[in-house]
Every structure is written in structure tokens, then in C-alpha cells.
């Protein structure tokens, strides 16, 4: 039995509002690697299926949070493909989307603030060095506050695929995953 249970909350400069990692079944509780960034699950899945990633990579799937998805899709397909290729312990995956209990490997989800709101996950670039430590409960990118602030000033919100309709309305009203993605007036 683990003193923390099967999941651990993480915080740091990459996830000031937090993120969740499932540690049940993990052999190592720390991971350091270089970011490999994707702006949706489909592009990440295509890269994984084509094996266009390597051991030590931290696969970043962003713009899948409550606002960005919209709806916070589950990343099980990508994590399943990584694990099926025998890379579950050799790469990590970080997303502002979510995972189910079936997820295997070093996967951090529910990262907030999400990319669609300009959270630090939106500011990552390929090659940035990321440290995840489930023992300490930390998740950080090796960038200074000044470097993150500079990137934030240059960041532009990604245009949504939805300009009207139910998903657009949802994206306008939903709150952060850290509060349960509420859609009521007290969302923030």
C-alpha cells in the first residue's frame, strides 16, 4: 500500500493550479526529459503511431482542457499506443486533458491553468527540459520566471474550431479543471 494512494497531486511552474499523476504501477516516481509539443491529441497520436518520438521525451498534449477541447477529452488512445509500443516507462506524457483509471505509464493530466487560457503548458517549446517528481509532488520546466513571462507576452490564444453552438457556449462558461470544470456563475 502506498501512503498517498494511487494518484498524486503535482504543482510547480508548469502547473501552478496543479496536475494529477497516477503512480499505481509505476516503477520510477521521477522523470526528467525534453518536451515534444503537440497542440491536440490527433497530432500526438499520429507522431506516436509513426514512432516520431524517442526515449526520454516528455510528450505534451495541450489545448485539450475544459476550454481548449472543449470538454477535456480523455487521452487513453495515445497513452495506450505508447504503452503498446513498449515505451510506457521510457517516456512521459503531460496534458491539460484527462485520463481514466486504465491509463498506464508516466502520465500527468488535468494540468492547470490549461493551454487555452495561456497556462505555462501553452508556453512550452520542443526541447524544454521538464522535471516531474511524484515523491515531492512537483512538476517544473527549467525556465526562469523571466523566460516564462517573456514567452507569455508573445503568446497568442489559439483560435477555437468552434465559433458557435453548444461546444462554443460550453467553452465560454466552463471553469478550470482544478475546480471540477464547473459551468455555473461561481466558476472562477
PLM ranges: what are they?
Residues 1-188:
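Feature captures the catalytic cores and cofactor-binding loops of soluble hydro-lyases/lyases
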Amino acid at each position: 500500500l502506498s501512503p498517498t494512494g494511487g494518484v498524486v497531486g503535482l504543482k510547480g511552474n508548469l502547473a501552478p493550479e496543479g496536475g494529477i499523476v497516477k503512480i499505481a504501477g509505476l516503477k520510477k516516481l521521477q522523470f526528467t526529459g525534453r518536451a515534444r509539443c503537440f497542440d491536440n491529441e490527433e497530432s500526438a497520436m499520429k507522431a506516436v503511431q509513426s514512432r516520431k518520438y524517442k526515449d526520454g521525451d516528455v510528450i505534451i498534449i495541450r489545448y485539450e482542457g475544459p476550454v481548449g477541447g472543449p470538454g477535456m477529452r480523455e487521452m487513453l488512445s495515445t497513452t495506450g499506443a505508447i504503452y503498446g509500443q513498449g515505451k510506457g516507462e521510457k517516456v512521459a506524457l503531460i496534458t491539460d486533458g484527462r485520463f481514466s483509471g486504465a491509463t498506464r505509464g508516466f502520465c500527468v493530466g488535468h494540468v492547470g491553468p490549461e493551454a487555452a487560457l495561456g497556462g505555462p503548458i501553452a508556453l512550452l517549446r520542443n526541447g524544454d527540459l521538464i522535471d516531474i517528481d511524484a515523491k515531492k509532488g512537483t512538476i517544473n520546466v527549467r525556465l526562469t520566471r523571466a523566460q516564462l513571462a517573456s514567452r507569455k507576452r508573445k503568446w497568442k490564444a489559439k483560435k477555437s474550431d468552434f465559433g458557435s453552438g453548444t461546444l462554443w457556449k460550453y467553452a465560454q462558461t466552463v471553469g478550470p479543471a482544478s475546480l471540477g470544470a464547473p459551468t455555473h456563475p461561481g466558476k472562477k
